[in-house]
Amino acid sequence: MAIDENKQKALAAALGQIEKQFGKGSIMRLGEDRSMDVETISTGSLSLDIALGAGGLPMGRVVEIYGPESSGKTTLTLQVIASAQREGKTCAFIDAEHALDPVYARKLGVDIDNLLCSQPDTGEQALEICDALARSGAVDVIVVDSVAALTPKAEIEGEIGDSHMGLAARMMSQAMRKLAGNLKQSNTLLIFINQIRMKIGVMFGNPETTTGGNALKFYASVRLDIRRIGAVKDGDNVIGSETRVKVVKNKIAAPFKQAEFQILYGEGINFFGELVDLGVKEKLIEKAGAWYSYNGEKIGQGKANAISWLKENPAAAKEIEKKVRELLLNNEDSKPDFVVDAADAEETNPDF
């Protein structure tokens, strides 16, 4: 429907005034002069990239990864950093827990010589560093480990036993309002690792909650719930963890998908194991008995030998990965893999 000529003139004058006052690009029509596709970074897990629907975690957004202790939260973020560095991106790690192991990070493929690292004294300092890095436009990925360790300055300077009700939640709420715009403008991905706490007196429903108030839940474009669901064994020796990640919130694709993969101790996510499983599932890799074949050529007897072949033939592995992504990404299947928990779906005040 055509807009009245006088209204068009008034709109053009208003747009011109806004651009003159706030700069070019401060207002635009949604479909013009911008890519509608969200740029993403791989998580290091093929099945999780597919569950996210866009091929990875979105740039310019806030992501929250939470779960119990030793569930693989830090490992997953280090794999994201390794993926970003392989693409030539600059990454920073805000180590509020003072627990980052550089030897382990290097084993996961992180270039620790080019990884920016900060161990802030207070929560305010950590969030100000995040904001400064985002505003610089020179850092592509920032990881904060963890929200629970972002202690307000007043709490650190006070006595043990003093009451500091709502301080951390207020600090996070203020920081998220400030960070959201800067992250979008600089196209910086900000990942918060978070811990789980139990609500007291919950008789029905899930008593679990995350720390730092509700602001992060609102501002996060993606929320991932990561859990250890079993052990990976070689004989009697435990060599890794079976891990399940649920996409609890997703603003870039259909939510409520889940992915399962292995995290091997000292190696990280078992990417090639996922590649074999998904390749067989999508009939890209043929499996007859214990033998695996690709393009009519036998690649190994048993899954371990098939994985070894893929590691030795990166071109074939890349080809299979590309085909799997083309088959499974951006399909129209929006059917959820799990039922969302009422605690995750409820709307509450974002300031606390």
UniProtKB/Swiss-Prot annotation:
Gene Ontology molecular function: ATP binding; ATP hydrolysis activity; ATP-dependent DNA damage sensor activity; damaged DNA binding; single-stranded DNA binding
SMART domains given in the database record: AAA
Signal peptide: none
Subcellular location as annotated: Cytoplasm
Coiled-coil regions listed in the entry: none
Sites where the protein binds ATP: 67-74
GO biological process, one term: SOS response
GO cellular component terms listed in the entry, alphabetical order: cytosol
Database matches in InterPro entries: AAA+_ATPase, DNA_recomb/repair_RecA, DNA_recomb/repair_RecA_CS, P-loop_NTPase, RecA-like_C, RecA-like_N, RecA_ATP-bd, RecA_C_sf
Highest taxon of the lineage: Bacteria
Keywords: ATP-binding, Cytoplasm, DNA damage, DNA recombination, DNA repair, DNA-binding, Nucleotide-binding, SOS response
Record bears the keyword Aminoacyl-tRNA synthetase: no
Entry keyword Secreted: no
PROSITE patterns, alphabetized: RECA_1, RECA_2, RECA_3
Purpose of the protein: Can catalyze the hydrolysis of ATP in the presence of single-stranded DNA, the ATP-dependent uptake of single-stranded DNA by duplex DNA, and the ATP-dependent hybridization of homologous single-stranded DNAs. It interacts with LexA causing its activation and leading to its autocatalytic cleavage.
Homology family: Belongs to the RecA family.
PANTHER family, sorted: MITOCHONDRIAL DNA REPAIR PROTEIN RECA HOMOLOG-RELATED (PTHR45900:SF1), RECA (PTHR45900)
HAMAP family, A to Z: RecA
The name this protein goes by in its record: Protein RecA
Native species: Enterobacter sp. (strain 638)
